[in-house]
């Protein structure tokens, strides 16, 4: 949310997403899709809507740059228990993968900053935002990760942090925690 707000300010837009508004906007997965949903919710004419929609790629690039800076500054910690879970899975010799609708740049920055510079290499597959045409709750991102792992769904477990993510993992046939 803060990175979006930073991007809006940098791009000269008067928008500020509160925690409450962002909570509602999180029902739309994918940053570009979330921006589109927000623009579509505005009480504006079709010409202004199209002009704003045309700015989505640049707004998203700007948001990603702000978010990556926040990650590298240590402002975006891992959720409790994630480090232990990753360490235990690695110690057990399990293959790890990531299936996320965020950008690969954000994933790699978060891994390197929170787990160490070599952490991106711990994952046998990373499926990120633009890899999947349909975002969660569609199963696409999980299907891509499974394909890259050459695994059937019953040979993997998904750990999720959102209802849309759980729906996506289950739709892909994965046991989900």
Please give the residue ranges for each predicted region.
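Alpha-helix N-cap/helix-start and coil->helix boundary motif
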Residues: 1, 32, 83, 103-105, ...
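Active-site neighborhood of HAD-like aspartate-dependent phosphohydrolases
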Residues: 1-21
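Hydrophobic alpha-helical core bundles mediating ligand binding, dimerization, or RNAP-core interactions
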Residues: 3, 8, 31, 60-67, ...
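A metal-dependent, Asp-based hydrolase signature
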Residues: 14, 24-71, 80
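A short, structured active-site edge motif that brings together acidic residues
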Residues: 19-27, 50-55, 119-133
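Short beta->alpha linker loops
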Residues: 30, 54, 77-81, 102, ...
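Short, acidic loop-to-helix structural element flanking the phosphoryl-transfer center
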Residues: 53, 68-98, 108
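Substrate-recognition "cap/lid" segment bordering the active-site pocket of phosphatases
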Residues: 73, 97, 103-157, 163-174
């Amino acid at each position: 949310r803060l990175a979006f707000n930073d991007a809006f300010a940098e791009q000269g837009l008067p928008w500020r997403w509160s925690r409450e508004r962002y909570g509602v906007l999180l029902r739309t997965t994918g940053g570009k899709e979330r921006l589109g949903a927000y623009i579509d919710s505005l009480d504006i004419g079709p010409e202004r809507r199209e002009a704003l929609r045309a700015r989505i790629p640049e707004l998203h690039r700007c948001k990603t740059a702000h978010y990556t800076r926040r990650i590298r500054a240590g402002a975006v910690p891992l959720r409790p228990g994630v480090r232990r879970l990753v360490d235990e899975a690695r110690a057990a010799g399990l293959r790890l993968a990531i299936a996320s609708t965020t950008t690969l740049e954000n994933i790699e920055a978060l891994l390197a900053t929170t787990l160490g510079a070599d952490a991106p290499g711990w994952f046998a597959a990373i499926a990120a935002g633009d890899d999947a045409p349909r975002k969660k709750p569609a199963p696409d991102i999980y299907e891509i990760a499974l394909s890259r792992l050459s695994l059937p769904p019953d040979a993997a477990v998904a750990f999720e942090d959102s209802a849309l993510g759980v729906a996506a993992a289950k739709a892909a046939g994965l046991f989900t925690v």
